[in-house]
Amino acid sequence: MQFARRLHLFAIIFVVIISVDISRAQEANKITINWDKTVKVSKTNATLQVVVNPPLRRGTPVHDNAYAAVRDLQADFVRYVPWLPYPKLGVAELEPPKDGKTFWDFTLIDPMTIDFLEATKGHSVILNFSTIPQWMFKDDKPATYPDDPNLAVWTYEHGHELRDPSGKEVADYFARILSWYTQGGFTDELGKRHDSGHHFSIPYWEVLNEPELEHQVDAEMYTRIYDEAVTAMHKVSPQTKFLGVSLAYPSNNPHFFEYFLDAKNHKLGVPLDYISYHFYAIPSNDETAENQQFSFFAQAEGFLNTVRFIEAIRLRLSPNTGTMVNEIGAISADDLVQGDPGHVTKPIPGSYWNLAGAMYAYIFSELTHIGIDVAGESQLVGYPTQFPSVSMVDWENGKPNPRFWVLKLLHDNFGPGDKLVDTQFVRGYVYASAVITRDGKKRVLLINKRDRPFEINVPGASGGQQSYVDGSTGFQPPASSKLASDKISLAGFSVSVVTLP
């Protein structure tokens, strides 16, 4: 009898414990949202960068689909970067003036640039012709480049010291490019007129790209070039605004920001409209695909701390200057050895694209809370030998991959003017951020940081809609479904937007 009573008592205690555990688990999966408490108003634009490379030339299998995706996105602040591996596609004056003539040539550059400007018509763009002609540097080696414009060359740039240390020669080069696209042409160094017929609006121009890597330009030299370039380009296009800094590794060089953002280091009247910098998650050589979900988000956390630190510098020295983080992505360890002889690109698992997309979504959302102006995903097209792991489209046909579809999901559902409201959620593997959009809709962004499913309870979601990108959507657009309850299912690396009824 006594045994039976004890057994009954233990059974009751067990049921109570289990009930409490279940209740706690349910509570742990429940998001608490205070829709009446606005913590910040977003000013962040989700966008991307388009890097010039041969697959984007007319007539390729990639060109039409890739630019159709850009056109359909309808994003602002799209960044366009002709850069160093393809001198004939990115440098407009490959040889110095000689024997009474100059060597300006936009024959190959124009079609690609015009296609970009047409695909982004009606929206703001950022141009960055990032590569300074090699002959403008003091160097014993002559500038060499392949005859084939499609052949990548990583040895075009060398040398550190400009042959014109004032930076005026470089500034005039950039001013003439800007004039080519905005003023119908320019007058060259020898007084000859070159007509283009172009009268595009170029609202933003970024001065150089990752200067600490390209020619190892320090803060002092960069600021000198920036001041000369902006002064010359403002005369051509007074309405154009400018981006400066553009560091690849912002956490390594706080002095660069301290120096550049201090007005006393600039010529009087030179505007400091925006600063920019970049972030890529990069796994170690021996890191497995399964482990990347941990390291990518850990690296993202470190970068966000860097952003907060830089913002403190900016607010102290130049509070009216904006900030654009205009390259956000991931680079595989394999891509870092793509230039090795005989290198063969390793297959990229499908889950990688979803992981990289989820990481971008997380950084984008956190940048809205910090108050950053632009969060630009990188990059439209990559392909074997040219950072394939960074691509946002299939390099065989130009159709968007999950990274692009995550960007579109974010762009179509969130933007400047959204009210970010108080959101509490204890589960660290799933990120949640609730907003009231400019048109009054209540939305919750959910990001699964892990390659395994979770169920989350969003109060009031029943009758609403869930739009998402995950492994099940593949290379297709975001999927949508009506919600029958407050319970939200998240597949591995899911990026989901829940719109309340």
What are these regions (language model features)?
Residues 56-70, 254-265, 357-364:
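Short, acidic/polar
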Residues 426-462, 469-471, 493-497:
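Carbohydrate-binding surface patches
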Residues 479-501:
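C-terminal beta-strand-rich structural cap/linker in extracellular carbohydrate-active enzymes
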Residues 8-19:
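Bacterial N-terminal signal peptides
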Residues 73-296:
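Substrate-binding cleft and catalytic face of glycoside hydrolase catalytic domains
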Residues 282-339, 398-399:
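Glycoside hydrolase catalytic-domain groove-lining segments
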Residues 325-414, 418-431:
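Aromatic/acidic polysaccharide-binding cleft in carbohydrate-active enzymes
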Residues 25-76:
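Mature N-terminal, pre-catalytic/accessory segment of carbohydrate-active enzymes
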